[in-house]
Amino acid sequence: MFNSWGRDPIAELVRPIDVMGRKSELLLGRTEHAVREESTSVIRGIRHDGGSAPSVDDIRDALELAYPGLVFVGWSAATLHGIEYAEGHRPEIWLPSQVRRQGVVVRCGRLPPEDVVAVEGRVTTSVVRSAVDLARFAEGDEKIVGVDQFIRIDRQGRSLTTKPAILGYLDTHPRLYGANRVREVLDESSTGAHSPWETYSRLVVHRSGLDFFRPQQPVPGTPFHVDLGSARYRVAIEYDGGYHRSKEQQRIDIARWNAITDQRWTIIRVTSPMLLSGRAAFLDRVARELRARGWRGPSPTVPPLKLPTIHRLNTVMEDETAGQILHNGVQFG
């Protein structure tokens, strides 16, 4: 017998007991104390032999063992589709009926079969549906981070999906819950963000009123682009994260910055602390540079930045995306 996704639930449950299983399975021939000493909890109720911390794949295996009919959705789907910075979030699954499980985001509701695909042997939502779900359910401005990563154009001119494809999905699903939220996210999304903090930098600058700064702005006379740039005023804004700390990257950056400033551009570097608690000073610096180059617009306003609940400087590295704090059993559909 196969379930609606074409999987054999019996085959899914046939796993070597000495690798992973429910506690009752691991007890065969062993005491409860021995099981606790010789195995490690992967998710509540499922353990694997050995003392090593469970990997992401271990957690996926355990969830599939517990729920043979699951579909990986949201950030879990994004990870399977190769989205950078998607790891670090709680596992997120869809089930045909409501359940609650500690540490797992569980969604339910209508999920059309055509929105379900297999990736790396896992059952997950399609690329477009995964992007739509992040736009509906991710926390705060991580909605925009997620969609940015799905539509980001790489050096070969490729992206996983596009804004028109996502809008097309909404057009063919007119009663989809949260569709207006998806459209709002798309309005602020961009194909030019290479990391979450580049997204946050753009949101702060654009929401302040300086929306003429272009993501991945080419610098004439050089082979380079800048994270955000105004070609008219020759002002560039560059996010300076941990990636730029290595000696080799600093050497590359200095040569690049020299080439850009040789074209009479100025470069303003921004860091995560500035975006989190120094937005007023950062935007004032940008405005002063613009005015020195002939800009006569109104002073920028300091906008909100809706970061995920646990995204704090003392707990999350500045180049990482934060895990989201969500209630289990959120309605899906």
Predicted segments with their positions:
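Short gly/ser-rich loop at a beta-strand->alpha-helix junction or flexible surface loop bordering the NTP-binding
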Residues: 1-178, 291-333
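Surface segments flanking catalytic/ligand-binding clefts of nucleic-acid enzymes
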Residues: 4, 16-20, 24, 155-333
